[in-house]
Amino acid sequence: MLIWENNEDIRLIICANNRREIQKALNDCREERRPYVFVTPTMREILQINRILVPVTMLEEETYKAEICTYLARKTGAHLILLKAHDYGSHAQQNINRIKTHIESVSAKTGIPISYEIREAQKDSFSLYKEAVERQNDTAHQLLVLTASREYGLDDLLFGPPERQAIQRSQVPVMLVNPRADLFSLCD
């Protein structure tokens, strides 16, 4: 496993595509305040980021991704695809609305248009990360941005956390954001 920490803003983790190595890296990054990106040998080589897929579930911490995704879209000119979980409650929609408001406010403040679209997923919040990985050819994105698990429950210990499963199956780099209110801010 290689961890590149020369960048103050983002931590890059290059590791083998096996569950032990990925889980070790996930455990090492549990307290990380900045986003971290996983790259494995089975992922496609990415030369430019044009589209970023951002799955949004019912969990409140999903909104923490807004700042980072907006920053990346603004700096790379990438198009954001917000994939909303197909839930019966209104929490996923509220999170989408918060992220949308943040994107539009940053765009208005900076004068830089940020392109985004909202797509409805077929799966609920609990299966959304799996669907995001399955839709890689459909969305043609070059980066997948996920929220890391806040706590590991029994199912995470038995089957692995959803972010580890997404990293193992993904064909593109996966950026993780820890669910913390005091996240490292990306500044210009």
Model-identified regions with their sequence ranges:
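Short beta->alpha junction loops
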Residues: 1, 116-125
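Short, well-ordered secondary-structure micro-motifs
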Residues: 65, 92-95, 127, 156-157, ...
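Short acidic/polar alpha-helix capping motifs at helix-coil junctions
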Residues: 32-35, 94-99, 126-130
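Short beta-strand-loop elements within alpha/beta enzyme cores
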Residues: 2-30, 129-169
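Small/aliphatic-rich secondary-structure junction motif
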Residues: 51-118, 137-142, 169-170, 174, ...
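Glycine- and other small-residue-rich loops at beta-strand/loop junctions that grip anionic moieties
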Residues: 58, 121, 155
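Intrinsically disordered or low-complexity boundary/linker segments at protein termini
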Residues: 2-67, 75, 83, 169-188
